[in-house]
A protein has these predicted regions:
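N-terminal Rossmann-like FAD-binding beta1-loop-alpha1 element of flavoenzymes
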Residues: 8-34
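N-terminal FAD cofactor-binding segment of flavoenzymes
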Residues: 47-85
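Conserved FAD-binding catalytic core of PHBH/FMO-like flavoproteins
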Residues: 63, 143-145, 152-153, 158-264
């Protein structure tokens, strides 16, 4: 085997989480090698699949600190309005009740990927190897030794799995998962609308699943329509005009006339959680560690919190002259993330089952709950601060501080 690369950390997966992990380590001078079997597109900002990401306030601070924030493409979320089907009761979150900052921002994934790739490729501490997957990886007390599918290989002090919900690294390490399907599929698209959205995000709970209208820059909005699996193929076969008509049936005319402004995509919705997020010289971040329903729009934010926590531990150990891939540091990472991951997954799962249930007594109870919470400003402020990520102390990067 020809050793082509030696670095302190090897990262499997060159998606958003993998590149964010590499750039975060680079900010403290730690060299990494990022590996992905897929090639990175040359100009990904021109490639749109309609997918967007909600970025919380603290996640934005982290991305700004790392130079990863594409501000020109980000739309602030100032208000959130939650309704349950045709009920007149609603829950309204106004960002001014929690401070002067937006509750979050919405941005198309293509712009995040473009910025992440640009910054990573410009770094001298980051080597990106694409087009060849990892065919073999060994972990022992001396470090990590890996072989790529082209026969080349390398060494590192530790390996980080950022290779998604079907993580090869997680499976090869023998880390089991638990989870289930929600029997729903998310249909994603971007619309152009006639009337201004005023940076208000809408989420309407329908029997088939939540229906979200999320503000993008200008006269555009992102649709995330979760629906029963059986109905999705029928909807996806409709032409654009008919599909837009189905969108209006499930929302209202507050945005005026609408039209599709790009391709549609879909993906099945499920919950998956790894039984462990660390092992011998190994750590998992992002979807490789946990995958959730998009009902709360927190999946990527949870992954960024993984990255911020893990990077802080790695950097602190390196400065102390300790082994960055040692068991003590990885145990600390495991402990630091346990409560946050478990709490958010449980809350998201509970909301999904509760609001996808059309049994009349359940529907009446949740409608009354929405109306009641809407009249409790302190509770609403607590919910907003939790969603913004400002409740409690977190890793330095989430507070806008450099490593």
């Amino acid at each position: 085997m020809q050793t082509v690369m030696q670095s302190e950390v090897v990262i499997v997966g060159a998606g958003l989480s993998g590149l964010a992990m590499a750039v975060t380590l680079d900010s403290a001078g730690i060299a990494s090698t990022v590996i992905d079997r897929q090639h990175l597109p040359a100009d990904i900002s021109d490639i749109s699949d309609g997918r967007t990401t909600a970025i919380s306030y603290t996640s934005r601070r982290m991305l700004e600190t790392l130079g990863l924030w594409p501000a020109e493409h980000a739309a602030p979320i100032l208000d959130i309005r939650v309704t349950d089907g045709p009920s007149r009761l609603f829950l309204h979150f106004d960002h001014r009740d929690a401070g002067d900052q937006p509750m979050g921002h919405l941005i198309e994934n293509r712009f995040l990927r473009a910025r992440f790739q640009q910054v990573a490729k410009q770094s001298r501490n980051i080597t990106i190897l694409t087009g060849h997957g990892v065919s073999d990886l060994q972990r022992d007390e001396t470090g990590v030794h890996y072989t790529l599918s082209d026969g080349s290989g390398g060494q590192a002090r530790m390996v980080i799995g950022a290779d998604g919900a079907k993580s090869w690294l997680r499976q090869s390490a023998g880390i089991r998962t638990s989870g289930w399907s929600y029997g729903q599929t998310a249909m994603i698209c971007t619309i152009r609308h006639q009337l201004p959205h005023h940076n208000v995000a809408h989420e309407r709970f329908l029997p088939g699943g939540p229906f979200a209208v999320l503000p993008l820059a200008g006269e555009y909005a992102s649709i995330v329509w979760s629906e029963r699996d059986a109905l999705v193929p029928v909807m996806m076969r409709l032409d654009d005009q008919a599909f837009a008509g189905e969108l209006l049936r499930r929302f209202d005319d507050s945005l005026g006339t609408i039209e599709l402004a790009g391709p549609r995509s879909s993906y099945p919705l499920s919950l998956t959680v790894a039984h462990d997020i660390a092992g011998t010289r190994l750590a998992l971040v992002g979807d490789a560690a946990h995958q959730m329903h998009p009902i709360a729009g927190q999946a990527f934010n949870l992954g960024l919190r993984d990255i911020a926590a893990l990077a802080e531990i790695i950097v602190d150990r390196r400065r102390l002259g300790l082994d960055i891939g040692g068991d003590e540091g990885l145990s600390r990472y495991r402990r630091s993330r346990r409560v946050d991951i478990a709490t958010l997954l449980a809350a998201t799962d509970g909301l999904t089952w509760l609001f996808s249930n059309d049994i009349p007594p359940v529907r009446i109870a949740r409608d009354l709950s929405l109306g009641l919470v809407n009249k409790m400003p302190r509770l609403k402020t607590m919910f907003m601060r939790s969603a913004m990520g400002t409740a409690g102390n977190g890793p330095r990067l989430l507070r806008g501080q450099h490593l």
